[in-house]
Amino acid sequence: ASETFTDYCAPLAWQHAGFTSYPLAVSAAQGTLYASMLRESAKRQNPSVYVVEVNGFLYTEAERDELGTAATREWLDTLPLSRNKVQAIDECVQGDRLSYYVPLLKYHDNWRKPDLIRNSLSLQQQARDAGYSYTKPFLSISMFLTETDEIPVRQQSLDDFNEQSLRTFCETAKARGIKNVLFARFPHRTVIENYDAVFAELEAVVHEYGYDFANFDTQMDAIGLDPLNDFANAEHLNIFGAEKFTPYLADYLAQHYDLNTAHSQAVTDEWTRCAAFTQQMLPVCEDNTRRYTCEKLDEFSPVFADCH
């Protein structure tokens, strides 16, 4: 879910608590994608705990219809051809699947958009040159809520489709022998009808599989979040909110799980560079947010070119 981009900054957690973390997210990803994301992650790492933001298991049928195709494309088109990609296409795509194997069928006319291609190639080259993401990756939305902003009321629920997606994810984790998964509701201002019942049901399913649930919506006072100034919108924290929530979540994880904070010199050097880059990035994000520029800033934004 996109909250993983905006609400949590891995280099800040490293500075605060000394552990490494590697967020993986696709904006508006629904729960059907999560099992393949877990399988892909498990190819590359064996973390002490997986943290799963639960919004993807709560989309309504209308929201899934509206957002599902774009999010599915964004995830599946990044995967190299592999057993996981084939399985993910089978799990997530209804109807014609050929273009998911042959992207040229979908994107053959992109030559008409040279600026789009140029920007994409530039971002890919920057990532290759560094060898890793400096912010793992973090996104700042330069906005804040005001008293006149309308807070949406959503009819989200753990309907049959969402429950099956959640169970499939849990079964995938169990089959891989993954012991620690924290399902988390990151802070939101959105109002969900039947809120208590929705999250009680979700928590009950998670506990069936022996996994954990934490609702940070209900801990905003403890986190110190301002309901207006720390939110970019009803769904996402801004930079000020992220700077509060990240250490809070880091402390929660350190208290509840056995996290490794002893690292090789190579890992320490990498994360020290990431933290230094992030510290240069934060004041710019803060200033843009105070000025309500509405910009979305990440490590590849031109304003940070000299920081690399």
Please provide the spans of the model-predicted regions.
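Secreted/periplasmic serine-hydrolase-like ester/acetyl group-modifying domain
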Residues: 68-178, 263-308
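Membrane-embedded segments
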Residues: 2-87
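Alpha-helical scaffolding within the catalytic cores
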Residues: 36-39, 163-169, 196-200
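Loop/turn elements at helix/coil->beta-strand transitions in domains of secreted/extracellular proteins
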Residues: 18-20, 45-49, 174-182, 209-212
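C-terminal regions of proteins
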Residues: 193-305
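Active-site-proximal beta-strand/loop segments in catalytic clefts of secreted hydrolases
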Residues: 2, 24-27, 53-55, 184-188, ...
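Active-site segments of SGNH/GDSL-like serine hydrolases
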Residues: 170-195
